[in-house]
Amino acid sequence: MIRNQGWSLLYRIYPVRRFTRYSRVDMTFEGNTQDISTSVEERMTTVFGGRLKGEPPRSTSRVLSGGTKKIAGVQVPAKPQEPDNCCMSGCVNCVWEIYSEDLRDWKHRRKEAAEKIAGTKEKWPKDWNPPLGLLHMENVPVELREKKLETDSKKAEQPHDLSAIRSLFPKRKGPLPKSVLAAKRKNIALRHNYEQKDGGDQSVSESDADEGWEDIPVYVKAFAEFESKKRLQKIRRQEEIKKRTALV
């Protein structure tokens, strides 16, 4: 009696979780293993698809690209397709980074072909994304000459200097901080080295920099370019380490 009262008092001060036995319950889990009319690949596209505008699935493999065309002696590839299979899991070889590299190579080859076709009577194929801003009128297909005039007029209207933008901000009363000046000098030196070592992307004019990224969120473009630059920096550091070890 006294022992039972002691236990009851102890349970009031320090509550104890009690376990109750239940009868066994049978549970059945049903998956999608029955009555499946689609293939494994088609079901994978519904899970790993990442299309930006809800288009139907399409292949974006680099192996199944649109081929190349020889223009003014330069093999110009087809315009890269936007990837639709990003899994958003931080892959080492991200499809957006690969797309950025393909787009950079495509712009570089297209600009090289536009420079070599100048002064000739050869016409750029109208179905091969002609760079109207880089071509002379005699090299533009007849069907696209009106569009070429519109492109040139828009380019002429754009200011070539930053005077219009600078006028929006008040003039600085004092000099820039030393840290800012040092950072500017460092960025200029890095940009100069990048143009010398990897001039492919820098050869593209700023007016064509956004080509291929029009319908893609800007944060995706920034992510792809950032990852590409970090990877190139890592490769350069590894090459410098190899050179130093070889000299030792």
UniProtKB/Swiss-Prot annotation:
Location within or outside the cell: Mitochondrion
InterPro entries (alphabetical): Oxidoreductase-like_N, OXLD1
One GO cellular component, as annotated: mitochondrion
KW Mitochondrion (keyword) present: yes
Transit peptide, residues from-to: 1-26
One matching Pfam family: Oxidored-like
Residue ranges occupied by any Oxidoreductase-like domain in the UniProt entry: 69-116
Keyword terms of this UniProt record: Mitochondrion, Transit peptide
Top-level taxon in the UniProt lineage: Eukaryota
Keyword GTP-binding: no
Additional detail: Present with 2100 molecules/cell in log phase SD medium.
Family designation: Belongs to the UPF0651 family.
Name this polypeptide is given: UPF0651 protein YPL107W, mitochondrial
Biological classification of the source: Eukaryota, Fungi, Dikarya, Ascomycota, Saccharomycotina
